[in-house]
Amino acid sequence: MTTTTHILGYPRIGEKRELKFAQEKYWRGEIDQAELKKVGAELRHKNWQTQASAGLSFAVAGDFAWYDHVLTTTLLLGHVPKRHRHGFPDLDTLFRVGRGQSQSSCACHGAAASDMTKWFNTNYHYIVPEFSKEDTFEVSWPQLFEEVNEAVQAGHNVKPVLLGPLSYLYLGKEIEDGFDRLTLLPRLLTAYQAILAKLAKQGVEWVQIDEPILALELEKPWLDAFKLAYQVIRSDVKVLLTTYFDSVVDSLDRIVELSVDGLHVDLSAAPEQLDAVLAKLPQNWVLSLGVVNGRNVWRSDVKAQLERLQPVKAALGERLWVASSCSLLHSPVDLELEAGLSAEVRSWFAFAKQKVSEVVLLGKALDGDAAAIAQCEAYSQPIQARKSAAHVHKATVQSRVNAITAELAQRSVPYAERARHQAEVLQLPLLPTTTIGSFPQTSEIRVQRSAYRSGQLSSAEYEQALKGHIADAVKRQEALDLDVLVHGEAERNDMVEYFAENLAGFQTTQFGWVQSYGSRCVKPAIVVADIEREQPITVGWSTYAQSLTSKQMKGMLTGPVTILCWTFPREDISRKAIAQQLALALRDEVSDLQDAGINIIQIDEPAIREGLPLKKRDHQNYLDWAVEAFRISAASARPETQIHTHMCYSEFNEIIESVAALDADVITIETSRSNMELLKAFEEFNYPNEIGPGVYDIHSPNIPSEEWIVDLVKKAAQKIPVERLWVNPDCGLKTRNWPETEAALANLVSAAKRLRKEFAKETTAVNSEAVADVETEA
């Protein structure tokens, strides 16, 4: 009885980010579409060959995306937003939806990108589908079928992957009032019928249909819709219904009624669901168990997994499939490239290519292969050795964590009193202007960093080069007349990796890249041991920048929850414990910054919402310790020290109480893509502190006009008192170039100055009316 082995998807970016570099060359006009497509084809074939050479039963097709797999599905379904429809959809259409289109690049007066948000509780972003009640769907984008043909012609046994109809609808949003997007399901199912019919004609036996929303706490109408949907799209192609990121026990009674041929569940995220799934699994279904974690870099304990799976194999026989927990999109590509790792550390890890081999090894061992069983034993030994390593578990760190009290997470005085102290010290105007922290990482900076790391630049030479970039950033900001400056973060390759490189307990990699969105990739550090700060990290750069200007300089820190969410965490201790260790380290940095004369310190927490568990019943426990971690890091600040925080792409309604509980003096948020909709949560909650709603989208190359910014700030002022508003971009400017940055910021500053005058006139007029009323009454 041969065990079927497969994965849910493979990284699409290439082991050295080949796709990223090709995309960006294409966008700059340096290569044509044919050259870009050639790079994509080469990556796909290499990925399929990796899977086939390892011995997987299937090669996955349809997991490749030019920007995002949800956006690919949008084009597959002929569902392009109207503002981006210019003839038959092509690759440029896809990029317009994802990136937007400036007025200067077309005759259509520009078109905004679609919203982008987090993919469940990961750091991957997807482009949000837009729905209106007149929408129709038609299969018009051939990418999936072309890639199936490519794989078949290359000799692979293909399993296409497709985002399911209910998840596609659920992950989108209505763009007009008065209708429920679920009413579009019958029309959408017609398109899915056509897709499956085409795949059947191509000879496909199995298709993987991803319905990750089944791991959520779905409302009854959504859950009930599944039965009809899968009856309607039933075809000659066998369907593996795929779920991941959490347990599906809540939805299991509905799932087992569906017209499908198998179910995949994520045992890495929710191992406790196995017994319930086995008890209710239909007799004719296969069961795919995701036991190799697709979201991390840790070597799988295949010995333990084998022992766990053997009884399931005995019960199900060939109906048991072994798989990755989710797509390996969330893992780096290949550990073999990491020449700089010690043998011990290397033995702890497995990247996507190695995880494929783990899946295959488990399949062979389950089939009784004696050599594979012995290999499982040997492969798991480093995991056991790590459990007792003294350099992993540090007594000094444990002692400090154990001493945490409620008082440690409390600022010395309430916000209202702090605000008075800060107003006296900072002397800022109405609608103060600032940026979120980073400035363009120019090619010169990247070349110098590379030269330093390769030994071509000495430490002293590199430090002088960085000081030059900092001085340049300060000079540009002063010329723009921004109110609160930043040093620009030239010394940081990444907002998390930089801290990981300067805190004990982390391991960084050279090629550990994963996709964040579009062409943007991140290289998460790995928490390998207890975390501690051995010396100041940012103080020298911030104080140097402050010495160059009489304006206020913001210190820039990445918060404990974001560092946790944007790194690969340990599996042997809780996320809460890691967050506490990080908070204590950052608390020391806050103390040193203010002692060095930095009066404003930003502790970025853009990832705080994405850390939420998928089940709402688990939210409060997470939010309690996440808020505590932030407060521990900030609470060493004196009353006159203003603490800022920044959050990205967050839907705040369900966490607004916890956002307020952070007790940051100023919060900056991304709001421009949502046209200030996100501020409703702050308005309804009567959020008491200061807010900087982002007034332009830094993820798009479009430069906002002064009028655009004025309009957004006025909308914000309808929801938040103007005296508590700041004016700033949505996010850091690292990925933009200097001409774009300066043009946008010039419009931002001029908009703020114009609005100060307008609001001052309104205040004067109101005061005059009040005086006149008093005189009349007299």
Swiss-Prot record:
Function: Catalyzes the transfer of a methyl group from 5-methyltetrahydrofolate to homocysteine resulting in methionine formation.
Active site as annotated: 699 (proton donor)
Record-linked InterPro entries: Cbl-indep_Met_Synth_N, Cobalamin-indep_Met_synthase, Met_Synth_C/arc, UROD/MetE-like_sf
List of residues binding L-homocysteine: 436-438, 489, 604
Annotated residues for binding of L-methionine: 436-438, 489, 604
Family: Belongs to the vitamin-B12 independent methionine synthase family.
Protein name: 5-methyltetrahydropteroyltriglutamate--homocysteine methyltransferase
Keyword annotations from UniProtKB, A to Z: Amino-acid biosynthesis, Metal-binding, Methionine biosynthesis, Methyltransferase, Repeat, Transferase, Zinc
GO aspect biological process, one term: methylation
Pathway: Amino-acid biosynthesis; L-methionine biosynthesis via de novo pathway; L-methionine from L-homocysteine (MetE route): step 1/1
Name of the gene encoding the protein in the UniProt record: metE
Cofactor(s) needed by this chain: Zn(2+)
